Amino acid sequence: MNISALKARIRASKEDLYPLPLEQIVVAEGALREAAAFIAKQAESGVVLVADSHTYKAAGRDLHDHLCQKGVKADWHLLEPNSNGDIIADEVSLISVMLKVEQSTKLLVAVGAGTIHDIVRFVSGKTNKPFVSIPTAPSVDGFTSLGAPIVVQGSKKTYQLVAPIALFADTVVLQHAPPALIAAGFGDMVGKYTSLFDWKIGSLLKNEAYSDLVADLTEEALSTCVDKVADIGKRTSAGVQVLMESLLTSGLAMALFGYSHPASGAEHHLSHYWEMEALRLGKKQLLHGAKVGLSTQIINRFYKNTVLPDVHRFLDDDEAKQVIALVEALPDPDDVKALLEQAGWNEALVPIAPELVEESLQHAYLLRDRYTLLRLYREGTTMKKEGDAHVGRS
């Protein structure tokens, strides 16, 4: 990725954004060697590498060999799955990593996908120890962001903490990632259709903070990703590189803005609701991006088929006109599904009960203090009903 070009765009925009957090981003074959060279410059000892048994085999072992060749002394911490076989970013995982961090620790290294990065990001932010990102799958857009979604006492909360100081993604490693993780990464990108929509709605109707540059960066990443969906589905080197760079751009956009609005709207709220229900019931977790792929279709269809015909009930004429134009510009939900399927996504990856879908459409907007069209619709129609009831009683 061309960080210099991105910095130039940021300067030219003259927008009041957060500084670009990463010193270096490499997405290429042989990136693990470059990662070892970077880490060696940061610290010759006091390096803690965090992975699980799968990501250690995927990239950790080779990275460790490269570090040894550079004379770097590094300790490993392998995260343990729960009874369902899932690595969860919860109190147990956080404490296990915290116990590996000592006063002499200079650098943390996250070797894995989204959850491992969430755990390391949280520990990095709380201990003031920088971390380096080594993604093993192009599965989520959170690698370069500031946010760490953490499960605390069964509920998920996102903590705004720190981005990695550098990221190295080896395309050979990415190509060998499980196909479901690659499909999930594409699902996370497809979610930008509705997240960008909801962010625009919040800005227009509720005066929420907005950035044209951040929106443009996110939209460009989405378009580039969609254009290469065939290559992504075939897991070509070019395909996984485009997907990884699109996900990273989305994460950087969030970091520049300081919040997740560009990449997380009602579609993510539905996904989080489903995840919390699975945690409550002790069920195995589903892939985040796979859920977002489904929730994007659901929320898109809900906006077009349910909200749009009812929009004048809770918005004035000028607001309704703006919302109608934006909803009509959203892609057809069936077209979104076709794109996802090209990337390897299928509904079997997300066996969500229809009852849970309906429940999430009713209540998921309450999970975040953020305006989305789903929130405006639920709150607006509720107020309308209450007002009508009051008139009826008077």
From Swiss-Prot:
- Gene Ontology cellular component list: cytoplasm
Q: Where in the cell is it found?
A: Cytoplasm
Q: Which Pfam families match?
A: Fe-ADH_2
Q: How is the cofactor bound?
A: Binds 1 nickel ion per subunit.
Catalytic activity line of the entry: sn-glycerol 1-phosphate + NAD(+) = dihydroxyacetone phosphate + NADH + H(+); sn-glycerol 1-phosphate + NADP(+) = dihydroxyacetone phosphate + NADPH + H(+)
Subunit notes for this chain?
Homodimer.
Record EC number = 1.1.1.261
Q: Which cofactor does it need?
A: Ni(2+)
Residues that bind Ni(2+): D188, H268, H288
Specify whether Manganese is a keyword of the entry.
no
Which GO BP terms, alphabetically?
glycerophospholipid metabolic process; phospholipid biosynthetic process
Which is an annotated GO molecular function term of this record? glycerol-1-phosphate dehydrogenase (NADP+) activity
Describe its function.
Catalyzes the NAD(P)H-dependent reduction of dihydroxyacetonephosphate (DHAP or glycerone phosphate) to glycerol 1-phosphate (G1P). The G1P thus generated is probably used for the synthesis of phosphoglycerolipids in Gram-positive bacterial species.
- Where along this sequence does the record place binding of NAD(+)? D52, G114, T115, I116, H117, D118, T136, A137, P138, S139, S145
Alphabetically sorted, this entry's keywords are: Cytoplasm, Lipid biosynthesis, Lipid metabolism, Metal-binding, NAD, NADP, Nickel, Oxidoreductase, Phospholipid biosynthesis, Phospholipid metabolism
Q: Which SUPFAM superfamilies match?
A: Dehydroquinate synthase-like
Name of the protein: Glycerol-1-phosphate dehydrogenase [NAD(P)+]
Family per similarity comment: Belongs to the glycerol-1-phosphate dehydrogenase family.
Binding of substrate occurs at D141, D188, H272
